[in-house]
Curated annotation (Swiss-Prot):
It comes from Schizosaccharomyces pombe (strain 972 / ATCC 24843). Keywords: Chromatin regulator, DNA damage, DNA repair, Nucleus, Phosphoprotein, Transcription, Transcription regulation. It comes from the Eukaryota. This is Probable chromatin modification-related protein eaf7. The keyword Signal does not apply. It holds the Pfam family Eaf7.
């Protein structure tokens, strides 16, 4: 019996020594966290990467990725993250909350304590809670409405606010500015680059080949006609108009000559 008791005591002592060695090794292997690494860890937890429950290892991989993406020189490992979370939070309480079917804990609405400020390496200016000012900031603009007296016979006039008036005035100012800019541009363009009107060259109409052929044919026919008519024939030939105007000479017979003499003598006699 004594041998058995000694064996059990030695086994318990060995376990204790192993636990102490593990704790010492963990303390020795703890890496120093920078401010940037701590902020990245807190951001990952706020986004929903909580290493609790059945899928805690997968969430841990996501946390490590975010830390390494944000700080490429970081040498933090999964064990370092576990140790940091163990110092900040009570992981057993987290697991109780995230355990499926744990209705008793949900009914109690158990709340986990937030970590102490001393555990962080963040600067004091960030961790200090600023006191809220007693007077809230007046963000809303006061709109003053002008009252207009209306008589029963007159139509109702719509009440315009100061904001609407300011909008109208700004629109008018913008339009006037645009007009001034356009005028200045026109005057500058005229003074810098005056437009010189060049004489327009006469438009040359293209000659169609068919019309050319017709005109050539007409010219050739006219030249042939002129050549066919000689100058002697032109002098001898009489036009019908000239034939009509010339008087017809009477025939040279003795009877006709006697009659003409009688007529002339009668016309010379004085009247009785």
């Amino acid at each position: 019996m004594s041998s058995r008791g000694t064996r059990s005591s030695t086994a318990a002592e060995q376990k204790r020594q192993e636990d102490v060695n593990k704790e010492s090794n963990m303390n020795d292997s703890v890496t120093e966290w920078s401010v940037l690494e701590e902020t990245l860890l807190l951001k990952a937890i706020c986004r929903g990467l909580r290493p609790v429950g059945i899928e805690k290892n997968f969430y841990m991989i996501g946390i490590l990725r975010e830390i390494r993406d944000g700080c490429k020189r970081s040498t933090i490992k999964a064990q370092d993250v576990w140790n940091k979370l163990g110092t900040l939070y009570n992981l057993k309480e987290f697991e109780e909350l995230e355990a499926p079917g744990n209705e008793e804990v949900k009914a109690k609405e158990k709340r986990i304590k937030s970590p102490d400020v001393k555990d962080f390496k963040l600067p004091k200016d960030i961790l200090k809670v600023k006191e809220k000012s007693e007077k809230p900031l007046e963000t809303s603009q006061k709109v003053e409405i002008e009252t207009v007296e209306t008589k029963p016979g007159e139509p109702e006039v719509k009440q315009e606010t100061n904001l609407q008036k300011e909008k109208k005035e700004s629109k008018v100012k913008l339009e006037s500015k645009e007009e001034k800019i356009s005028r200045n541009l026109r005057s500058s363009s005229r003074s810098i680059s005056p437009v010189t009107e060049q004489p327009q060259s006469p438009k040359i109409q293209p000659v169609i080949p068919e019309k050319k052929e017709k005109s050539e044919k007409k010219e050739s026919s006219m030249t042939l006609r002129k050549r066919s008519v000689s100058p002697s024939s032109q002098n001898t030939a009489r036009s019908p108009k000239r034939m009509a105007t010339e008087p017809i000479e009477p025939a040279s017979s003795p009877a006709a000559s006697n009659q003409a003499i009688r007529r002339s003598s009668r016309s010379r006699r004085p009247p009785t």
